[in-house]
UniProtKB/Swiss-Prot annotation:
Monomer. This is Arginine--tRNA ligase. It catalyses: tRNA(Arg) + L-arginine + ATP = L-arginyl-tRNA(Arg) + AMP + diphosphate. It is an enzyme of class 6 (ligase). GO terms for cellular component: cytoplasm. Its EC number is 6.1.1.19. It comes from Bacillus pumilus (strain SAFR-032). The gene is argS. The keyword Ligase applies. It holds the Pfam family Arg_tRNA_synt_N.
Length: 557
């Protein structure tokens, strides 16, 4: 348990004790203590509505109850400096700030582990994200999904969940046939031969590259092969090429995966029929008009869904159900899918399938990634000026840098449309949030270097934390102390942007402290050491938070 949790628990215990001591209720009758952090810090560090909760039990006005609680409260036991009553009976608590200095040694000793919580309790969570078709470059929606998905995985891991990151390779559908046909066209063109591009063909530069590579490596060998042999080879070659490109792009984006799961393996390993049989045994499959259907309306879907068409071919839904059954068979406690905005309508049928398999709908969570719009010079940008094509993830990283791309994509709720300001992302000003945060980290590192040059360094044995007493220092410590709670909240609510908000608050408090206080005082070694220790605690916390969203913490800028 971290110090912030210890303080809150002590405060809750003392509130309950005060309620009982004041004769307002028996301990068994006291409701759960709700503590909130007031938005306005002049209203204290914590606030509770316990008086309103007790009104019916104590048969008194909430304000009178609040006064009784305040009189019976032992401030010393809960590190409380003072209390006051606001409005109809809210009780505000102002902490004795000296308790905050206990955070400094705790953070310095925890180092990279600071912020870890046991919120997840080892729960096995699988997060499937990106899962773009291996038929071309990753676009902006994929990039946002990759950044959000990886950040969420990092946060879940920090919060004590057992996380598995998975990429589902769509390699069994018609898109792979189209990929092979498109490669064939470019291969023939590279040899100076004509071939018509199919209507659904892929026209990207990367497909031209595959065709040229094949021509260079094999000459006209495949011109003389049978169509069947040629397509088989081009499917495998094109898929391998595109997958490797995806892997490299994602690794360069600091997005690793534990599992790359092939859709084709569902067929090869006989996973489809058992999934269908399970649904049939549970009574949710029926035949109509020559097709096989899932009775998804039993679970709130707006209509029943076809699983097998009249011609005997599978719809997308059946292998998807088999895939999700396989996930559940692997023993995951929770499945999280991160999908693009175009998949929104697919959620009810997939949730229905999960329930038809015998699991609660909540076993599958789906986070939707909304669209991204780029702006440059105040105008919406649709195409890359360099290529004349749609902007890819690689283009964006080249334009604004890896850190800015990761930070900006993690900065807003994934459920909202995003306007990505390219000019802001590359500006070296405090208006740019990633620059502001990284500059705070570099500024701390500079202070630590200056201290070292003068013979001072963070030292818990030499530091006298009674020197930590300014409002700016306490503001920093309160934010540092809140980091584990932020991690827990971001994990539980699946909101990585909560961490970027926190990073901004911590950076802002650091800059404010830097502009108001002097860290190195050559006439007072214990004070200097205490403040350098505070700076080290801030640096550790900021670096840990940045790491969660895949952003580097530079020591110099």
């Amino acid at each position: 348990m971290n110090i912030a949790e210890q303080v809150k628990d002590a405060l809750k215990e003392e509130i309950i004790a005060a309620v009982v001591k004041a004769g307002l209720a028996d301990e068994s009758q006291v409701p759960d203590v709700l503590l909130e952090v007031p938005k306005d810090k002049t209203h204290g560090d914590y606030s509770t509505n316990m008086a309103m909760q007790l009104a019916r039990i104590a048969k008194k006005a909430p304000r009178q109850i609040a006064e009784d609680i305040v009189k019976a409260f032992d401030k010393g036991k809960a590190s409380i400096e003072k209390m006051d009553i606001a409005g109809p009976g809210f009780i505000n608590f102002y902490m004795n700030n000296q308790y905050l200095t206990k955070l400094i040694p705790a953070v310095l000793e925890a180092k990279e582990a600071y912020g870890e919580t046991n919120t997840g309790g080892g729960q096995k969570v699988q997060v499937e994200f990106v899962s773009a078709n291996p038929t071309g470059d990753l676009h902006l929606g994929h990039a946002r999904g990759a950044a959000v998905g990886d950040s969420l995985c990092n946060i879940l891991d920090k919060a004590g969940f057992d996380v598995s990151r998975e990429y589902y390779i769509n390699d069994a559908g018609n898109q792979i046939n189209n990929l092979a046909l498109s490669v064939e066209v470019r291969y023939f063109e590279a040899l100076g031969l004509e071939k018509e591009m199919p209507e659904d063909g892929y026209r990207g530069e990367d497909i031209k590259g595959i065709g040229q590579k094949l021509a260079d490596e094999f000459g006209d060998r495949f011109v003389h092969e049978s169509e069947e042999e040629r397509m088989k080879f081009f499917r495998e070659y094109g898929l391998k090429y595109e997958l490797e490109k995806l892997r490299v792009d994602l690794e360069n984006f600091r997005v690793p995966f534990d599992v790359w799961y092939s859709e084709t393996s569902l067929y090869e390993n006989g996973k489809i029929e058992p999934a269908l049989e399970t649904l049939r045994e549970k009574g949710y499959v029926f035949e109509e008009d020559g097709a096989t259907w899932l009775r998804s309306t039993d679970f709130g879907d707006d209509k029943d869904r076809v699983l097998i068409k009249k011609d005997g071919s599978f719809t997308y839904l059946l292998p998807d159900i088999a895939y999700h059954k396989d996930k559940l068979d692997r023993g995951f406690d929770q499945l999280i899918n991160i999908w693009g905005a175009d998949h929104h309508g697919y959620i009810p049928r997939m949730k229905a399938a999960i329930q038809a398999l015998g699991y609660p709908a909540g076993k599958l969570e789906v986070e939707i990634i909304q669209l991204v719009h780029l702006y440059k010079n105040g105008e919406k940008m649709k195409m890359s000026k360099r290529t004349g094509k749609a902007v890819t993830m690689r283009d964006l990283i080249e334009e604004v840098g890896l850190d800015a791309t990761r930070y900006f994509f993690a900065m807003r709720s994934a459920a909202t449309h995003m306007d990505f300001d390219l000019d802001l992302a590359i500006s070296t000003s405090n208006e740019n949030p990633v620059y502001y945060a990284q500059y705070a980290h570099a500024r701390i590192c500079s202070m630590l270097r200056q201290g070292e040059e003068k013979g001072y360094e963070p030292n818990l044995e030499k530091a006298d934390f009674s020197h930590i007493q300014s409002e700016k220092e306490y503001d920093l410590l309160k934010i540092i102390g809140g980091f584990p709670e932020v991690v827990a909240e971001a994990a539980e609510k699946r909101i990585p942007h909560r961490v970027t908000n926190y990073i901004y608050d911590l950076a802002s408090a650091l800059h404010s402290f830097y502009n108001a206080e002097k860290v190195i005082d050559v006439e007072n070694e214990t004070k200097t050491t205490a403040r350098l220790s505070l700076m080290k605690a801030t640096q550790i916390t900021l670096a840990n938070a940045l790491k969660l969203i895949g952003v580097s913490a530079p020591e110099k800028m």
